[in-house]
Amino acid sequence: METEGLTLDWNAHLPTVEVAYGLTKNSLKMWKSGTTATSDDYWLYTDGTVWNGVGVLGNNPETSTGFEKITPNFNASIKTYSASATDGQTDFNIPFTFSTITVFVNGSIQLPGLNYTVSGSTLTFTTELEAGDLLYVFIGNPNISTNDKLNRIYTANAMQGQTTIQVPYDFSTAIVYINGVLQNPITAYSIGADRIITFSEELYQDDEIIIMLGDIIIQSDEYVLKQELLDVNASSYINTKSGNSIQEEFDILYNSNSISKIIYSDIKNINWDEINEIFVCGKTLNTTEGAGYFYYDNNDTITVEDGGTCFVINNKRIKRRYIGPALSSWFTTIDGINTFLSTGNVSLRFDSNLTLTKALTIKSNTNLYFNKDVFLFPSGPTIQGLICSGSVSTTITTTLTSDVSSSSFIVNVTDASKFSVGDYVEIRSEKLVEGVNAQGVKIGIMRQITKIDANQLYIDKIALYDFTISDNTLISKMDIVKNVNIDGLTFNNINYTTLFPITMNMVYCDNIVIKNTQLYGSKEKYTGDVSGRTALKINSCRNVLIENCNAYHQGWYGVEILGYSEEVTVDKCFFDDCRHGVSINWSSIYGEPNGILINDCTSTSSTLSGFDTHDIGRNITFSNCRAYKSGDDGFQIRARNVKYINCLADYSTLDGFGQGDGAINTRLIGCKATNNGRNGFSLVWEGGNIEDCEALNNQYGYAMLGGRIINSRGIDNSSACVDCGSNSDPANQFSLYIDNCDFPYSTIQTRCLYFRGSSGIRPELVSVKNTNMAGYGNLWYLLGGYSSQPLSPMLNNNTLDINSTTAPTSGMVTLTAGTATINTSAVKLSTSSTASTLRYVSNIDLKRILSSSNIGTLSISNIVNGVSFTITSSNNLDASTIYWQISL
């Protein structure tokens, strides 16, 4: 048989040989050495005859090779070859003799002729591969048949929604691929009458269908074992290396209920020095869970067994061969998954539900993917979900030899030899962060070393703070977790029953991406806070993207960002029933968040504020975010340099946008506050800048200590449009500028400006110009709590009345004998000195439209509040036509 190209180390057996060479069934016998043959002998012997015209078999008995173990086809050995392509590579030399070949690139089947050709042992692709493309081939020798019909391939392109296809050839067997991916005949398709293949799901337009057809059904090894070798006329006890009969081996494999049981019960007895690779079936013959190819890696003596991708048998590392991510269903324990993850540089796809008895610990360069409708469940109240945790060394440290400025990239240290280029370091001091409410947090940053020159460390970003020797600055080496991608996690579910603390906890990390998550919390729906229970905690991490992540019913926060976290983006996320959807927090000893972007996120029904900047942090931006039905403020502002762009706060219990202690340099652009229980915008701590914003249907539209309101609107705010002094410390009041705003009267909004004397507010620090205050008349302001009349605000070019026939605010008049009296209720003059009133007078602009031959200087006199005013020329012969306009 060896001379004919059949080697027994492929586990060839007689019925297969008979089919391959077209011999009559049962014509080939297993003979022992000698000159005669009986059906009871088990060694091959050749008698010198011509074998069906194929060739002379020879005269010597083949005594060196015996049939030792015949493995069923669902667990059969197969010869494979794999390689990783270089960029532009097209040719691969296959180091085996073969007659048949099936080729995959990156897991997708390739079509002969269209995608590749074979010449001798050289496989040539029709297009260049890219660097890292993975080639995987199955090869056979010899061909099962010279009949082309056994190797026929039928291809087609699907129509949108197509579920059936009729093959135009007769066939008995079919192997089906969709877009190059092998389909499971149990779950993906079925074969019916009239050559019709029915798919279990609708196909998409132009899906590529590839069907490999066969005209005959070759008896499977399982059938041969049962029907040929194990009937009453055959030998039932052909021994295997384990000492069991083939039937016993088959029964063990058939009844094994997990991949690990198969490995430990059966495969541990295999001589892996002789066998290159085996295929192991899954839990049952009808499922593929755990199925795969395993090989002995004789170069590995250290990999730890994980029960899914590596098994240690007699100190040999038996490894799973696979392309793409490992599957969680391969592992039988959480410890096994953590062992697999412990090395880093791995990818894992969760393809079945998993109850966590402990947290999953993630290392650098790890990708985690989760199938749709797959859940991770916590098993108890102390179980966290996923942890990415680095550390800061307490021994590999050094100190400064000179102070470091906030803009510097260079750090001069006492001993740079402790560090290497590429190391991450923590730089921290005992100096508190800025702000009146620093909460004991001290300045700190994470940086990467880009260059070392003597005792100078060059860092990848500026220092941000002034680090000094006097503040006991310390530089410590860090062991961080970096380059982690988590995609599609669903943690817990809406019908949760188990309390747990944190779903994902990231500490000392760099370059983290978390996408497409559904994170259900651990408190009763729409009840109060449960401290310490957060969906995503980002502590002292850099370069983090959280995208399309949703969190529900969190006892504490949806996303919490703290420590010296930097360059963190939270994008397109949804938070329901959390204390805060996003909280910029202070609970780490060193460092404050910096450079944080919250974009296109929504919070609903938060226990307190929908979005919170909690006491510290700087350079934080909320863009296109929405807070609905917040239990406190929609957006709470207590950090430095916070910017809000095109955000909405609707139906908050208190303020739409509410400022607290610690807020400095707040800026709101294009934001909208509607239907909030107290203030639409409340900047009563450090003031701020409001531009192009709208306050609609709140109690007060704007509550301000100082700052600017520019190009903004205030409509239907029930108590007043602008409240000067609410919850303010008068000692901190500074100038408030209102310019080019639209604050009109309505039956709901009956006052434009409210000055709180009880808060000691000084109206003269308020300037209002170019603003529409039409409709209020003399009721444009309200004073409260003053014991004596305050000074009036500075007013310029504001519209106070709606232009009408009885109250015209502008018009033209021709002077008679140098004078004219205008009757209009729009003219205002307040001379009262009581504590509840302000003194003011209308500003009347005059412009000569048509001059007479005698002109003089124009002036206003005889203003009667709400009645009239007089225009007078210094020349009593002046008969010019004058345009007049009243403003406040």
Swiss-Prot record:
The keyword Lyase applies. Keywords: Degradation of host capsule during virus entry, Degradation of host cell envelope components during virus entry, Host-virus interaction, Lyase, Viral attachment to host adhesion receptor, Viral attachment to host cell, Viral tail protein, Virion, Virus entry into host cell. GO terms for molecular function: lyase activity. Gene3D superfamilies: Single-stranded right-handed beta-helix, Pectin lyase-like (2.160.20.10). SMART domains: PbH1. It is found in: Virion. GO terms for biological process: adhesion receptor-mediated virion attachment to host cell; symbiont entry into host cell via disruption of host cell envelope; symbiont entry into host cell via disruption of host cell glycocalyx. Transmembrane segments: none annotated. GO terms for cellular component: virus tail. InterPro entries: Beta_helix, K1-lyase_C, PbH1, Pectin_lyas_fold, Pectin_lyase_fold/virulence. Its main location: virion. Belongs to the K1-specific depolymerase family. Functions as a receptor binding protein (RBP) and probably mediates the attachment to the host capsular exopolysaccharides. Displays a lyase activity that specifically degrades the K1-type polysaccharides of Klebsiella pneumoniae capsule. This is Depolymerase, capsule K1-specific. It comes from Klebsiella phage K64-1 (Bacteriophage K64-1). The lineage of its organism: Viruses, Duplodnaviria, Heunggongvirae, Uroviricota, Caudoviricetes. The gene is S2-4.
